[in-house]
């Protein structure tokens, strides 16, 4: 991954964390690395544990940020969330996978939250 892409991703994750806090989420962990993959943000929304995938784009020629999530990435997100729950003995908690789309193509960043993006809880 190029330096510019890493910097764009890092900026997007920082903006997303602040955005989520403003929406009432409590940020538990960022950039959580597991054997199955990385979880960008682990947060709590009320009683629900949320595993948040952040997608950031500076240009929209190839689609919106959320459209860049492949079936393979979805499978990794599910496996990573399950692994996290087991590792920290949190299987009893309700959980979901959310997406935050960060559009940096305009002067002001545009963020959008998609709760329960995979439709499973």
From Swiss-Prot:
Family matches, as CDD domains: PoNe_Nuclease
Family matches, as PANTHER family: UPF0102 PROTEIN YRAN
A Pfam family per the record: UPF0102
Family (UniProt): Belongs to the UPF0102 family.
Protein name per its UniProtKB record: UPF0102 protein DET0781
Gene Ontology MF term list: nucleic acid binding
Gene3D superfamilies from the UniProt entry: 3.40.1350.10
InterPro entries recorded: Restrct_endonuc-II-like, tRNA_endonuc-like_dom_sf, UPF0102_YraN-like
